[in-house]
Design a protein with these regions (language model features):
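Active-site substrate-binding loop specific to GH73 endo-beta-N-acetylglucosaminidase modules
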Residues: 1-247, 388-391
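Flexible, low-complexity segments enriched for small/polar residues
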Residues: 153, 157, 161-190, 201-391
């Protein structure tokens, strides 16, 4: 997470290498301590990271056009981006990497980029996709070629650009939107490839992001964790100890059905190409990744968990509603203020009026009554479809 924050608006090539040499990633995907092949014992390099860095972090499974559409072969099927043999070759580049100065007295090594141990690095020539690495190249040189090759692959822009659009703006971006973002990925206007700041700017300022989102496929479902984070930020949630100990919020029946840093696998909480089956979205082949987290249990679990969090906090983490309590005697004003803060104008006047009518039924003649009005207004707004679907 620290690396992602550090490189979020930097260059993708640098981010890719930082993630690759991160001890945390090295442990997670078995690259740390990976050793060269041994013909006597039959040992071969671990292929886990070699597979995932291509499938998930850079080029994806199939070759893409600039607009994100798969390239098709003569048989009409998508063309694969890489083969098993190419995974095996890349895994040889990822040998010999380990902690930089592991020490029982100095824990700083767990944050330093991994370094290469020549004794464990695979010997001989190597190949990364179409790039040749000579037998004379050491671990650092081979890594540079691998990172350069992956970062410069034409798939990276449309593959990752589309996912950035999905996370920031809409689950089902048009091919033209993807192509425009991929174009900025390829060249930020100053000849620089992979400028993430420029790419994010292109995503957020694109005409499809700024225009009225009236199409049925527009927008995205807010992830449960993002809803919780917005509640905390909007209402000044604080942790007296500084530990922010909210526990595991994975349970779908009683909590969020999602928990920070606890995705069930390297494939994260949901697939970028997920299409909800048995739904109007599914009938129209509209991707909606976050809906993969949704079912009957999560719908009820989210509301029950949120109700408790709003009123009582989550353990030591509690919000403050001083400004909202000052508006509690005026239900329409309270709801309008909260709606603007939570949705940025995305909740209609009709929905606000309905919620305000319900809030007004709560007696505001006491401090407890005022607090209950605030709690109820926040809960109903954050439960409304117009809030849950961000447009």
């Amino acid at each position: 997470v620290d690396l992602l924050e550090q490189h979020a608006f930097g260059n993708y090539r640098q981010l890719l290498e930082a993630v690759t040499l991160s001890p945390a990633m090295g442990v997670y995907l078995a690259m740390r301590g990976n050793q060269k092949e041994d013909t006597k014992t039959g040992r071969v390099p671990d292929e886990n990271y070699a597979r995932e860095v291509m499938q998930l972090f850079s080029i994806g499974l199939v070759q893409l056009n600039a607009d994100g559409a798969p390239k098709l072969g003569s048989d009409g099927k998508p063309l694969e981006t890489y083969t098993q043999a190419q995974i095996t070759e890349l895994a040889r580049v990822f040998t010999g990497w380990d902690y930089d100065g592991a020490s029982s007295t100095d824990p700083a090594y767990v944050k330093k980029p991994m370094v290469n141990n020549p004794a464990r690095f695979a010997t001989g020539a190597k190949k990364v996709l179409d790039a040749d690495i000579p037998a004379t190249a050491d671990g650092a040189a081979a890594m540079k070629t691998a990172m350069d090759t992956l970062a410069n692959h034409p798939n990276v822009g449309p593959f990752l650009g589309r996912q950035l659009i999905q996370r920031l703006v809409t689950s089902h971006p048009s091919p033209a939107y993807v192509a425009r973002v991929a174009g900025v990925w390829a060249d930020n206007g100053a000849g620089v490839r992979g400028d993430l700041k420029a790419v994010v700017r292109a995503v957020l300022l694109d005409s499809e992001a700024r225009s009225a989102a009236t199409a049925p496929s527009a927008g995205k479902l807010r992830e449960p964790v993002q809803r919780l984070l917005q509640w905390g930020r909007s209402f000044g949630a604080a942790s007296p100890t500084g530990l922010w100990n909210i526990g595991d919020t994975t349970n779908p029946a009683t909590r969020l059905g999602q928990s920070p840093l606890r995705s069930p696998s390297v494939f994260n909480f949901f697939r970028p190409g997920y299409v909800p089956p048995g739904s109007t979205l599914g009938t129209n082949a509209i991707t909606a990744p976050e809906f993969q987290l949704c079912n009957e249990s999560t719908a009820a679990g989210y509301l029950n968990f949120l109700q408790t969090a709003i009123a009582s906090g989550i353990g030591e983490v509690k919000a403050s509603y001083t400004a909202e309590l000052a508006l509690a005697t005026d239900a329409p004003a309270l709801v309008a203020d909260l709606a603007l803060r939570l949705s940025g104008g995305g909740i209609s006047a009709e929905t606000q009026a309905t919620i305000a009518t319900a809030v007004a039924t709560i007696n505001a003649g006491t401090d407890a009554g005022k607090a209950n009005r605030v709690y109820a207004a926040i809960l109903m707004l954050m439960a409304s479809p117009e809030y849950l679907i961000q447009k």
